[in-house]
Amino acid sequence: MRLEKDKTGIARHRQWRGLKDTLYDYGQWLKLWGILIKWALRHPVLNVRAVFRYRWMLSYLTVPSFFDRLTGRMGGEGLRACRMNLNTVADVVTKDLEKTLVADEHLRPGNPNSKKIIYMDELIPKLVTAGFSDHVTILAQAIPAYLPSLINQHSPVHYIEASESYGLPADVCPLPSLEAGIAIEDDFPKVGCCFISCNMPCDGSIMTTTMQDRRFNLPTFPLNIPLRWTREDTQEYAVEEMKACIAFIEEQTGEKCDWDKLKEACERVNEQSRLKMEKWELNRTDTPPFIGGSSWIYRIFSYEFGCANPRVLANDRKVNAILRKPFEEGRAPYPYPKEVRHRAVVWNTPANMYAHFNAWIAECWGVQVVCDMIDLQGTQIIDTSTRESMLYGLAKMVQGSTMRVHTKGGWEVIMNDLWAKVEEYRADLIVMFDQISCKGVAALKGAFEEQARERGIRMVWVEQDLMDPTTISRRTMRDQVNQYMQTVMGETPLDADLVDFDDSEAW
């Protein structure tokens, strides 16, 4: 019998992982509740008003269930790394949410705190504004759009339908459609002295920025990022854009960029990047210690939200020490899944509405995801020796942003990098997400299949619609994998209870 009830996905009881791991997991679960309760009690009246003002606020009430789904049946080092990362996310995000609501002019009209905030597109890492310590940077779409779409699969549906009712085509990528819907419904917090937009990750996001810009009604700087970002002849332009962005922020805030503080922040980011690359190196071994959806979710968070954050860096150091320990002691990490049949590379953008897909495919079919495309971003080491070299490194980091690091830049980053990762991680299976609303990658489907055949690599296609569970459900995604594993691979599941179930009403 599955731990979760059909349809709702509510757990019948907590996952049993053995005495030691169960107690640890329960302790971290209580720690999460402590973070959430502490956040709620700091501004109880304001938070209640926010729940009634913003539809997306309700999704944050389900965070404990979301974290439980991501941990799956993990134990040992993987469980500890997962829980530590997730609680770090909760700690940092609740602080940003508090700063946002305290400054929100929708909740407190004429709020003077609003002008102390730099509003910025979620695809731009906070490192860009690290030299402006008198102001707070808030990633505009992250709190009302991106994070709720991970936490609760139903959260985006209302806003996507609002966009379509307004006249946007139904085949638009759900990411810009969701953001446009939030703007139409006026559900973005009203904060900021200025707004930094960008042309990432795709053309759809550029178009939805125009709708957001109308709603924000703030002085706006469009930070334009070269599409051919791997070419050296585009870097002069990228650096000039970065300089212009910093000058714009100085003009709007009245604060001069502190280059010494920016340098310190860049050096912290460099250490974070080195620690991330160490995790990749551990995953290339025969016994990768850390897999699951929490890996790529934490990477997106640490690149955008948590870059240069001392709290995040301290967590990275602790997590890496835990993951290194079994190798230093000459033993294998905790076995997850219980039987490893395949080492897989996941390519293309994963489905937000099924963030724990990696846990399911591991526990049902023994597929160990050792490399996620969405995890491979922003690890450019920044040369801090001069201001110019620092700006160059900062520009390169921004260009290697979430999703677009592989979906923009040409054949070499979307196609050649895939085969390089298959070789590096010694993968025998590719899980290829077919994001049906993404027109760019869809054009390469035949090329992917042809090159996989030439190399003798198995490839399972999994159709999904990113943030819209009404188009392709979690169950439909699982069915595609089930059919492939049973008919093409001729395999039987590790756990038959996980093959087919209904979680249509689950968060």
What name fits each language-model region?
Residues P144-Q235, W461-E463:
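Active-site and donor-binding regions of nucleotide-sugar-utilizing enzymes
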Residues E122-E161, V345-W419, E423:
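Redox- and metal-dependent alpha/beta enzyme cores, enriched for Fe-S-associated oxidoreductases
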Residues I118-L127, C198-S205, W347-Y354, I436-A443:
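Gly/Ser/Thr-rich loops at beta-strand to alpha-helix junctions
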